[in-house]
Amino acid sequence: IQKQDNGLYSITNLGALLFAKDLNEFARLGRKAMRVVKYKGINRLLIQKEEPFNQGYAICFENIVRYVNALLPSNEDVNAVQLSTTSKFPLPSVREAIANSLIHQDLYITGAAPMVEIFDNRIEVTNPGTPLVDVLRIIDNPPKSRNEKLASLMRRLKMCEELGRGWDRMVLACEAQYSPAPRIEVFQDSTKVTLFSEMEFSNIPMEDKLWSCYLHACLMYIQGDALTNKSLRDRFGIPETSSSSSSRLIKEAIGKNLIKVLDPNTAPRYMKYIPIWA
């Protein structure tokens, strides 16, 4: 809030965006409320559920995450003691994608709002605005926020952090479930991040295999390590008997100038690979 000359107080746009009970009460902010849409199947033909979250981000963020998680398909694990369910999607990645869409949106673009679209096989999180950093360097780039005050307040409210680790965590969570890495698509005035459910290696499109391989190399590099045939097999859950699959993917990634050999003089069996920019 800000104190006016007449002694009264006014609510700033930032205060309303975070703490408003209803964003529609503020002319410029009504379209900034996040929407969550659940579709039937894998296309947009039939909408099953649609929910706008009209409260300020600080009030409704956790509710958005819980609502989205509740709509995600899950697996039931039955053992002798109890029944448990596990999501088919990497939940830490879902949370990070939602937080990023709120923090990094371009608030000056009118007629557009952050949106989460849920399909049977993927989640698409879209926000107005394009990335401030090169997509290929999204893992190792220092943090850069479009809305510094918004990001700072959300960090103080423990909704996010400003350490630039969001994408690291998103990719690691996907790797833990053998899911493809989050796909980034940049359009003229918006950015879309797609998270995929569990998928067999043979069913992953080649473009997503290459992107996952590249981001795995980036993660290994910033940890002081390097991508190997074994680490890539572990990342995708490929058995050792199918090591030729990971070898072909590495060769393809080299051909696309995504990764390169660390030491060309190393024996092929012990070859290590790093991102092309390293």
Region annotations inferred by a language model:
Residues 89, 239-252:
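Short amphipathic alpha-helical interaction segments
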Residues 123-158, 199-218:
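Glycine-rich/acidic phosphate-handling loop/turn and adjacent ATP-lid/helix
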Residues 254-265:
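A short, conserved structural fragment
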